[in-house]
Amino acid sequence: MKILRKNHPLLKIINHSFIDLPTPSNISSWWNFGSLLGMCLMIQILTGLFLAMHYTSDTTTAFSSVAHICRDVNYGWLIRYLHANGASMFFICLFIHVGRGIYYGSYALSETWNIGIILFLMTMATAFVGYVLPWGQMSFWGATVITNLLSAIPYIGSTLVEWIWGGFSVDKATLTRFFAFHFILPFIIAAFALVHLLFLHETGSNNPSGLNSDSDKIPFHPYYTTKDLLGIFLLLLVLMILALFFPDVLGDPDNFTPANPLNTPAHIKPEWYFLFAYAILRSIPNKLGGVLALVLSILILAAFPLLNTSKQHGLIFRPVTQVIYWIFIANLLVLTWIGGQPVEYPFTMIGQIASITYFAIITILMPISNTIENNIIKL
């Protein structure tokens, strides 16, 4: 068996990736979230596949087909709620995974980091088009508002929006193509995740100390497979508690009403995991400026390898940047809260301050703290 897994063309790839992979001996539980993301993706693809068997992407029947899944399909309610709450778990793991990458300086592995950003954007796109499918009020108006942002692009904006809509408003053509995108994108994400792993295994994993760990590596199996299994069981436990006891806690009450183009909800807002970006979008009065800020709020992650001037890897021995990092996390939570609030004083002002802080921390405060810490080392 040992010879087979080391020599067989297919098993050899699995062996080098998950069994005999040399791994730093000191990586903490913060490194578990990569495998948890893989688990989330598998859950989403499986539950999504079963939902797609019963869902109809037609404006007249989409809402009732989701109700039919919950009422008439065997365990359809469970599959639907696992899928809906699985998306929330996916994004929780994703935010922690990116946060760990920033804290421990994993962005130094630039190819892995940049593919990670592409994965992040694709996951956001998948979640957005997926939210439109139940065809409730918030689905319809969320799709209308967010796709309409593209009209801010000079010259081609209006044409682009109508091209995406497949008509002059969000309608049957839009729903059909969004269903097609929602079905295909997770498989593209899975392919990119493999490329993400490929680049990671070229350089080897980072570790909490930020030091070179070539002299102290252990095989991935059994040490980290068992550790990952614990993380997976905990993730499944939280997901099952969410799906069985609080299935609608992260949803929007407006989505229990079928889509009605003649009735606008009081507060149009996306799912909770987009609220931070939505708050940044809303904090700029100019439409094009808001769209640019929205895109930059994610793409700015690509600036981390370029702006890092520190002589140390990661923040574990850098108290000044540690304080700034935790202010950054708190600021993100404030943005998430503001994104769900109505557009009125004082929320608009808090949102504008938090948006400026978000970009200032990454582009100004962190590079300054890097320089300060470099000078402290010289003393």
Curated annotation (Swiss-Prot):
Organism: Akodon fumeus
The protein's name: Cytochrome b
Cofactor descriptive note: Binds 2 heme b groups non-covalently.
Cofactor(s) required, per the database record: heme b
Family per record: Belongs to the cytochrome b family.
Pfam families named among the record's database cross-references: Cytochrom_B_C, Cytochrome_B
Keywords: Electron transport, Heme, Iron, Membrane, Metal-binding, Mitochondrion, Mitochondrion inner membrane, Respiratory chain, Transmembrane, Transmembrane helix, Transport, Ubiquinone
Residues where heme b b566 binds: 97, 196
PROSITE patterns: CYTB_CTER (PS51003), CYTB_NTER (PS51002)
Primary location class: mitochondrion
Membrane topology of this protein: Multi-pass membrane protein
Matches recorded under CDD domains: cytochrome_b_C, Cytochrome_b_N
Domain of life where this protein originates: Eukaryota
Compartments where located: Mitochondrion inner membrane
